[in-house]
Amino acid sequence: MSVKIFGKGKKAALKRRHARIRKRISGTAERPRLVVTRSNRHMVAQIVDDNAGKTLVSESTLMADFADFQGTKTEAAKKVGELLAKKAKDAGITTVVFDRGGNMYHGRVAAVAEGAREGGLAL
């Protein structure tokens, strides 16, 4: 998987970091990959089986569960992790590989991981 990403900006650097991480991390049916995508306003977390190329479970701050949520973005990210863990347990998933998507493991990305752990997922 050699992807040429040109540019000097933050988005290009993020894509280069994510490409480096994806060389080493892949999800299987037994241990799928938990992918975290972060924007300025929202968080998206998906559990993906890379062998089948399918998203097994997903949760986001864009979903109906967050229509009346009042709190900080970090609190919302933690709730995303907790709700994702609940959906994953219902689907029979207990362990995952964490893919931070090229972002630093800090703040909202770490909050998603903490929420998933508190919800019962093993990262």
UniProtKB/Swiss-Prot annotation:
Taxonomic superkingdom: Bacteria
Presence of keyword Membrane: no
Any single GO CC term annotated in Swiss-Prot or TrEMBL for this entry: cytosolic large ribosomal subunit
GO terms (BP aspect): translation
Any one GO molecular function term: structural constituent of ribosome
Keywords: Ribonucleoprotein, Ribosomal protein, RNA-binding, rRNA-binding
InterPro entries reported in the protein's UniProt record: Ribosomal_uL18_bac-type, Ribosomal_uL18_bac/euk
Family per record: Belongs to the universal ribosomal protein uL18 family.
PANTHER family: 39S RIBOSOMAL PROTEIN L18, MITOCHONDRIAL, LARGE RIBOSOMAL SUBUNIT PROTEIN UL18M
Oligomeric form and interacting partners: Part of the 50S ribosomal subunit; part of the 5S rRNA/L5/L18/L25 subcomplex. Contacts the 5S and 23S rRNAs.
NCBIfam families for this protein: L18_bact
Record function comment: This is one of the proteins that bind and probably mediate the attachment of the 5S RNA into the large ribosomal subunit, where it forms part of the central protuberance.
UniProt-recorded name of the protein: Large ribosomal subunit protein uL18
